[in-house]
Swiss-Prot record:
Disulfide links within the chain: none
NCBIfam families: galT_2, PRK05270.1-2, PRK05270.1-5, PRK05270.2-2
GO biological processes: galactose metabolic process
Metabolic or biological pathway, per its Swiss-Prot or TrEMBL entry: Carbohydrate metabolism; galactose metabolism
Compartments, record wording: Cytoplasm
UniProt similarity note: Belongs to the galactose-1-phosphate uridylyltransferase type 2 family.
A GO molecular function held by the record: UDP-glucose:hexose-1-phosphate uridylyltransferase activity
Transmembrane segments: none
GO CC list: cytoplasm
Recorded catalytic activity of this chain's protein: alpha-D-galactose 1-phosphate + UDP-alpha-D-glucose = alpha-D-glucose 1-phosphate + UDP-alpha-D-galactose
Primary gene name: galT
Protein name, UniProt field: Galactose-1-phosphate uridylyltransferase
Keyword Transmembrane: no
Signal peptide: none
Length: 493
């Protein structure tokens, strides 16, 4: 049954906040201030808060009181959803009051709030294409990321002409909490951060708006300081998995090519998700002198990973620190491993922490950011022949076996499917060689089979991408070279 749109929205705001019926006129005027009084007579049949918010924005655009750009609508939409969001102090008080008796419930409540107020973009995330496919390294996870709207040319032009601002300094800074937003910086009116302390310093815990996996979280330093992998990193990650039950925590590497997209602000990522790398077994056990109490092994994975397990956090931190320091100074010409050139360091680690079965676990992924004439984008980076699927940096999430692929692939892969079925010749030039190979391998593919054929091939290519990013190859020679590094660590003081 249809009812007034503004009235329906205000009713749900009252039901989902500390506002009361007496506040209805006040809230109605708040809504009019944001989307304009031209929406006053619009009706709706929806009963979902986020749908009503979207309808208010659309009605405002139609009435001319809300801008047409996604960025303009996001700014107003975040303010509308801020009406159901408690103040930062209330959010933190509720979190830590609940945490005292039930940490899992405190985390769950904050996650529910972050979805309810549309900070975590549940509707947008649902647009992503996601599937699993078997490979020789186990099932890999493939996602085509469609949740973030493409930049409108008008928005790009507007951002170019926008007044420069360095507030907030980046999208991870604490100052984003409640920030209105602008054409070139996301709206954050409905953003809330849980404060916590590590080593006597302020840190923040939030969810990622465009999550790549379940309860995708960000843990960020209170100060705007660059990413740096150090002994402190290992301790912090282990502290996080201890404080946030059921979550993993990991850090992107701190060097270009092998690092993530944000190197300017110290932060880690985590969440409640079991990645393919976590379930990968140990390819070969190794031992480190003086650490017989720590379980150690080389993981059966396309990238070069050492797994350490112990009940004692301090022992893990000590061994991980030794491995990091040795890796930063280690070169092996025959293996193509070089610690530095012209004063530029090439070696770092992508670390991942977990707590399982009463033990702490650290995966240390060895990274090398060398380039060469043959591989100008990176020797240990997706090579040219697989860049038609993935050419971006291999960061923390992909290291663990979840591919984040660009939106262009949605239509490009459909064109490849049509090509295999003989229903079209419009294949993007970057895919032509691959499409021809698939056609030769699957001459009689049917319409029922073709999507699976293409998806499986994409997963196989992603496995190759990870192999390219691996410093030591997965053959016997690569294993021997990896073990030579382990020997080097054992010889170090």
């Amino acid at each position: 049954m249809a009812e007034n749109l503004v009235n329906a929205f205000v009713t749900l705001v009252i039901e989902n906040s500390d506002y009361e019926e007496l506040d209805r006129i006040y809230l109605t005027n708040k809504v009019f201030a944001l989307v304009g009084e031209g929406v006053a007579d619009v009706e709706t049949e929806s009963s979902e808060l986020i749908d009503l918010k979207d309808q208010l924005l659309q009605a405002g655009v139609k009435a001319g009181s809300v801008g047409e750009l996604n960025e303009e609508q996001d700014i107003i939409g975040a303010q509308l959803m801020d009406l159901i969001t408690p103040s930062p102090s209330a959010v933190n008080r509720n979190f830590w009051d609940t945490y005292k008796s039930n940490p899992e419930q405190a985390i769950a409540d904050f996650y529910v709030q972050s979805k309810r107020n549309d900070y975590v973009k549940v509707k947008a995330i649902a647009q992503n294409i996601a599937y699993k496919a078997p490979t020789k390294y186990g099932d890999l996870e493939i996602t085509i990321n469609l949740s973030k709207p493409e930049k409108d040319p008008k928005a790009i032009a507007a951002a170019k002409n926008a007044v420069a601002s360095d507030y907030p300094k980046c999208q991870l800074c604490m100052e984003n909490e409640g920030y209105l937003g602008r054409i070139n910086h996301p709206a954050r009116s409905n953003h809330r951060v849980i404060r916590f302390q590590m080593e006597g310093n302020d840190w923040g815990f939030q969810y990622s708006p465009y999550a790549y996996f379940n309860e995708h979280s960000i843990f960020f330093y209170g100060k705007h300081e660059p990413m740096h992998i150090s002994p402190l990193t290992f301790g912090r990650l282990l502290s996080i998995v201890e404080a946030f039950p059921g979550y993993f925590a990991g850090s992107n590497a701190d060097l270009p090519i092998v690092g993530g997209s944000i190197l300017t602000h110290e932060h880690y990522q985590g969440g409640r998700h079991t990645f393919p790398m976590e379930v990968a077994g140990i390819k070969e056990k190794v031992s480190f002198d003086g650490y017989s109490d720590v379980e150690t092994g080389i993981v059966n994975w396309p990238m070069s990973v050492l797994r350490l397990r112990s009940e004692d956090k301090e022992r893990l931190i000590a061994l991980a620190t030794k491995i990091l320091n040795c890796w930063r100074g280690y070169s092996d010409e025959k293996a193509g491993v070089l610690a530095q050139s012209d004063g530029h360091p090439h070696h770092t680690i992508t670390p991942i922490a977990r707590r399982k079965d009463g033990k702490f676990e650290l995966d240390l992924v060895l990274r090398d950011n060398q380039t060469s004439e043959e591989h100008p984008d990176g020797i240990y980076h997706p090579h040219k022949d697989v860049q038609h699927i993935k050419k971006e940096n291999i960061g923390l999430i992909e290291v663990m076996g979840l591919a984040i692929l660009p939106p262009r692939l949605k239509t490009e892969l459909k064109d490849v499917e049509d090509y295999l079925l003989g229903q079209g010749n419009q294949v993007a030039p970057i895919h032509q060689e691959w499409a021809d190979e698939l056609k030769a391998q699957n001459p009689n593919v049917t319409a029922e089979e073709v999507t699976e054929v293409v998806r499986q091939s994409v997963a196989d290519i992603f496995a190759r991408v990870l192999e390219d990013a691996g410093v030591y190859k997965t053959n016997s020679e690569g294993l021997d070279q990896f073990k030579a590094f382990v020997d080097f660590v054992n010889l170090a003081d």
